[in-house]
């Protein structure tokens, strides 16, 4: 088939491909052959990079709530602010320290530019902390050098080195605090690799780390400029060209301008990085920082401990939404309201069968489903492991099929419909969704099921159930196995007693109906208890042929025999309603 696409007419001449701006040439790359086997070191930057991007920056109270959340989740390195840039950030850092809010195993991180008065203020803010990371940065990209700073490479190196020396000097003013260092060549992705390596190596010499006290070199995609594989190539290249690699933690800080921050972080980690900075749910400047939730749960679904607790994901989301005053989108990876929801009929059917297969496998092994590998189509994670329920997994609209409808009836009402009944009832629901549009809830599906197959609920007793209603039954059997059935049957407005015999209650009741002029043939019969308890209700499903019409009936009763007779009444009444309805429709 020939493509019919045409030129867009957009001004593509204004933009240069990345490879014409920055050369990243690593033809002997090794990262594609590697696998992720353990979690990286994490640093949550919600309170700094995330907060500065908010329309309504966090109040001190919301900041404390966010900090406490990050601590509870298990983050051990948390960037808490830019204390030299605002009094609010300075006061927040001081409150954490003075109020003893920082656990001993958590290290706060503070950001500073490479200017003396800002560095001095930064050290003043962390005085008294048990330990802290001072994060020094200056911009190194070609564009920033030419447009913002109007200086050459040496001028940028001088800024970084002077900043590093000042940090070492001011460290002496807070001997009670164990200070670690991080350096970021900001706009790294727009920086020539050889220059990025040169400036990083020069800064490392000033900080003079050891294998026991490593320095963090953060290589940010301040603006995402290329595909994730290019970022990974640059990280592997840098790891090869850092002079004191065993004394360095290589950190990633991807932004999401091109929508591939998660992929960039994962590939960059494969390429040799040790650490990743990001925000919960991808908050941050422009399109956001890399999403720490997506990264962590991606690991979890591969059987790798993220070392972060996501077991109350809805609670985490609610807290983040409160603090950021931003909603997490419904389709946000792993956390959105619709992530574990299937509307498609084929998806619903596959999910239903997946749950059933896991139950069978677990029973065969004599264990619970939590003790066997998770294997449900379209659900790469068990929602319950993240604190979600199965209630919203299957939702029904006009695109749904029998699987979703059957799943909801089984999950919410313990009704395990035979396959052909699933098909029949899904058509009833489909007609409703086609007529009314939108989503049909589980409660609405149950109401439709009752209206179609069961007597009217007690609060709707004025509504007629149909032509026939079984009001009482009594059975007896003789030594030859024949069953005698006595029933009280309402037929329209008349109530009459009837009796018949057969090789069982069902055969006898079919004879009762034949005596009333209704010919019924039984095609299939299925029953099950609605629970495992001894006093459980029984559900019966019968497939009938009534006056040449094939359809199903459903009965629910404490007595399984009575349930089967009620199922026959259900099917017969449905057949009669259908024959009455069709001429009316034809007349219209």
Swiss-Prot record:
EC numbers: 2.3.3.13
Biological pathway: Amino-acid biosynthesis; L-leucine biosynthesis; L-leucine from 3-methyl-2-oxobutanoate: step 1/4
Presence of keyword Nucleotide-binding: no
Keywords (A to Z) from UniProt: Amino-acid biosynthesis, Branched-chain amino acid biosynthesis, Cytoplasm, Leucine biosynthesis, Magnesium, Metal-binding, Transferase
Protein name: 2-isopropylmalate synthase
Function summary: Catalyzes the condensation of the acetyl group of acetyl-CoA with 3-methyl-2-oxobutanoate (2-ketoisovalerate) to form 3-carboxy-3-hydroxy-4-methylpentanoate (2-isopropylmalate).
Subunit structure: Homodimer.
GO biological process: L-leucine biosynthetic process
Domain of life: Bacteria
Phylogenetic lineage: Bacteria, Bacillati, Actinomycetota, Actinomycetes, Micrococcales
Enzyme class: transferase
PANTHER family noted in UniProt: 2-ISOPROPYLMALATE SYNTHASE (PTHR46911:SF1), PTHR46911
Regulatory domain, as annotated region: 456-588
